[in-house]
Amino acid sequence: MSDAGTFGEYGGRYVPEPLQEPLADLADAFDEAIEDDEFREDLDFLLEHFGGRPTPVFHAGTLSERYGAEIYLKHEDLLHGGAHKLNNTLGQALLAKRMGKDRLIAETGAGQHGTATAMVGALLDMPTQVYMGTTDIGRQEMNVFRMRLMGAEVTEVTRGSAGLAEAVDAALEDFAADFEDTHYLVGSAVGPDPFPRMVREFQSVIGREAREQIQELYGELPDACVACVGGGSNAIGLFHAFADDDVAFYGAEPGGEGPDSNRHSAPLSGSGSAESEPQQFQGMRTEVIDEGTENHSVSAGLDYPAVGPEHAAMAELGRAEYHAITDDEALEAFRELAESEGIIPALEPSHAIALAKRLADEHDTLLVNLCGRGDKDMATAAELFDLT
């Protein structure tokens, strides 16, 4: 164990001894790379010319009238690949190349991180293997096709609940067996150090852009920033640029069938969260759902039983609030944004839209991270809304 990369009592590097040195080397390489102007220039070039940055901020006028507050959307759904994930995969893949690694592995739930990893693997000519649970393969077939089309090997994970957490376990095992040549491209702000701060760094472009853009549109900073939180990469990427401002932070956790039920994925706001103690989980110390709670969300990208350690620390400090959004609330927001603005969100940011609706009585101006588009969720939506 190491106290590297801690956020108060959270974070750290809780891994077997054989992984301590590889992760320390990765941390050193990351710290050097982000101070290297050439690395920064290469990343910025690809984010602009391959990824399509900057993504715009859009005032959702009709939705604002409907909810009773000014709603601004940070359009990460317009990034190449359809979600915010490319910000991180480009950064980590360039770092892996710099370190002399020749293979990428990743976990994925909704398939967006797997797709973004397959994209950079193809771009940089690096063999790519993506671990994905059986449950998620079944509900995210389009993204499985996309990954395979771009040359990635998609490996089905059948253990346990066959979801995102099990995919992370499988990827960690692969990395432990082949860390000399392989880079584990972690998709969220979770895991042992340096992954949480590395992912935050590469996703912080979201907040840097949004902070400037909303001031141009609105004339001042928003009252609050809102984002969905599973592991929490899109949220920490938005929040980080506003950390020293008088701006409230709200995270929408997946409340599943209800925060007081035994089927949700909301460790900071679900049943038992007030009495919970931090646990060691997948290489980090963080908050995890109760043992008797079944990890569940209508959103494949949010059904993760823990939360990124920086979010756990922000909740403890009172810097951010986390609220459970049920499946039904997220689905209602999914439909409301589509009907109001002609924008079909992914089910993940639909949780953030639903939380913005709940917060509209408390704040005049809300900046919401629309971290992905809903193409991947259309089969689910068509069935649930009887659109066929």
For each predicted feature, which ranges?
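Active-site-proximal loop->helix
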Residues: R103-I105, H113-A171, D260-G272, T380-D386
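Positively charged, low-complexity intrinsically disordered leader regions
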Residues: M1-G11, E17, A24-K101
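Short glycine/serine/threonine-rich phosphate/pyrophosphate-binding segments
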Residues: G82, L86-Q92, A106-L124, G138-E141, ...
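Buried hydrophobic positions in well-ordered alpha/beta secondary-structure cores of metabolic enzymes
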Residues: G12, P56, L73, K85, ...
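Active-site/ligand-binding loops adjacent to catalytic centers
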Residues: V168-P194, M198, D246-V247, G251-I343, ...
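Glycine-rich ThDP/TPP pyrophosphate-binding loop and its adjacent helix/strand module
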Residues: E166-D174, D181, V190-D246
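Claisen-condensing/thiolase-fold acyl-transfer catalytic domains that form or cleave C-C bonds
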Residues: V229-S233, G237, D327-L387
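A short, small-residue-rich loop immediately preceding and capping a beta-strand
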Residues: H80, N88, R98-G133, L221-N234, ...
